[in-house]
Amino acid sequence: MAKLAFYTFAALEEAFRHQHSRGFVDRITGVFESAEQASGFVGRADSARHEGQDAQWGDPLATPRFNARQRDARRDNSPEVSPDDHEAPTLSLWDDLESVYAFAYYGRHAEALKKREDWFVKPEWPSFVAWWVENGQIPTWEDACSRLELLNNEGPTPHAFDF
């Protein structure tokens, strides 16, 4: 049975370590824990900022091409701040669309989602993309970026869609 790959991408206005981002950073662990306990959750790639990145998920530093344009919109664009200090991607695997929808719009994640404008640059792209993968297949960060770009450029297709 196929599984649903789900990728989110957002750009923080300030770096993770900046006080402005504290409200978001303080919620990360709780939101990840609630995802891992959610019905239909299969697994997730660790962020590039965490030790023990599992290589089967691909290069955790992959980023959508259109993100470079958004870097200029951030307040903290000093040269000593790495671009990935602002990027907040997630990549996960779910049993079905209904499960990830329930996680995204109810509970801890929904609470954080309501405050996203406090922390993130308003995107000019879709904030997430979903696509089906064969059972046993692990989606990669690179594929996720390509799927988000496809959704951005062509709208929903069977290969890249939203809710």
Feature-to-residue mapping (PLM):
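Short amphipathic alpha-helices within nucleic acid-binding modules
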Residues: 97-106
